[in-house]
Amino acid sequence: MHIIFYGPEGSGKSTQAKLLSEKLKIPALVSGDLVRKYAKEDKGIMGDACREVFKTGHYVADSEMFVLWKHRLKEPDINNGFVIDGFPRNLDQVKFLEEKLDKYQKKEDIVFFLKVSEKESIRRLLKRGRKSPDGSLHDTPEKIKERLRRYKKEEKQVLKFYKKRGLLRVINGEQSIEEIHDNIMGIIKKYE
């Protein structure tokens, strides 16, 4: 299966992606992990771009995300399926992902949208207190609100695209981790 988790930061995408990855025994491809890996390990232009993201609190530019994902989608561990978290974030990224998945004879089976309020996203992110690789606080209230504003601008188009394709499944992301996982597994079982 090829599954995408979509939703604002703090909606629980990473938690659910990792749970589902373990349950289905397929890799979780986490956008943030890719960025952190390049920020830590890459000494070139891509590493610099990823490190800058943590300093500014902005997203990685589409062109740079495309490079990261192009390399990741070629790796053989995803041949039997995957769970994606944190990508795509906008319609250009959706189209890029579609093109790459077609090239590798794969396609999305389900897109889970974890729906949470802005207030809940902010609460969770502040509680998490995520730090950048350099140790500085990445999740300040101002940075969080700015990222959520940018996310909201793109959300409607992305959801419309996946809904039109019949792939979108909306999950109440304000439930417990276990309740969300149970809802997801209930949907997954219909595809087996």
Per-segment meaning from a language model:
Residues 1-192:
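Glycine-rich phosphate-binding loop of ATP-dependent small-molecule kinases
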